[in-house]
């Protein structure tokens, strides 16, 4: 995947998970949540204000010491994501933000979660796993077979798209390297639809009616 333009202060991710973190502390406030995450070696070189994708959610480091980092999560993010559901001891997918010169694997992920959705069905094959995820009808227009989606921060290819659900396939590397390997039918996942697809779809929806008015 080649990005045609990366702003100097881009807070971008690729959906290639670098490791798993562990929730050490979670405290609810009236307007949000504070999380402390054990990042292990991924905490090396961390700075205040750095961006880290935690289960696909772009969060800002507000405090750190050794191998852990703290993040403040606003209510709007909690409403859209599964971060509020994470318990102490839970594991999360971790990706540090993209730096100039990094390999551009996966696809462009912004860390801005669109919604959370529950796994409906899991189909296990000898080595791989297909998961079916619920899909509210108004999100359907952003998904196409073979298109991109970030699921809990993991860059995945869409396999099937139906009116109320879609599927992705997980290879052994993804199952072992990310938290998706432990996901069950009760698991809620963070979804971020491909940004370029959203821009195209929303632009067409906005412009096409005006164009049709002129030609009819």
Model-derived segments and spans:
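Conserved loop->alpha-helix
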Residues: 2-216
């Amino acid at each position: 995947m080649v990005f045609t333009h990366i702003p100097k202060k881009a807070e971008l991710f690729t959906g290639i998970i670098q490791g798993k973190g562990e929730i050490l502390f979670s405290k609810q406030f009236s307007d949000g949540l504070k999380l402390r995450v054990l990042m292990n070696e991924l905490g090396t070189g961390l700075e205040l204000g750095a961006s880290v994708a935690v289960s696909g959610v772009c969060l800002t480091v507000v405090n750190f010491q050794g191998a852990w980092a703290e993040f403040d999560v606003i209510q709007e993010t909690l409403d859209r994501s599964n971060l509020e559901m994470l318990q102490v001891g839970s594991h999360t997918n971790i990706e540090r933000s993209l730096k100039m010169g990094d390999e551009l694997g996966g696809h462009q992920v912004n860390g801005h979660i669109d919604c959370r959705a529950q796994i409906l069905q899991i189909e296990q094959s000898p080595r791989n796993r297909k998961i079916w995820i619920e899909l509210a009808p108004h999100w359907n227009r952003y998904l196409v077979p073979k298109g991109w989606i970030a699921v809990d921060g993991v860059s995945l290819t869409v396999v099937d798209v139906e009116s109320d659900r879609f599927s992705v396939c997980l290879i052994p590397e993804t199952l072992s390297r990310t938290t998706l390997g432990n996901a069950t039918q009760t698991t809620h996942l963070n979804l971020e639809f491909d940004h370029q697809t959203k821009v195209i779809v929303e632009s067409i929806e906005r412009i096409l009616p005006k164009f049709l008015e002129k030609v009819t």
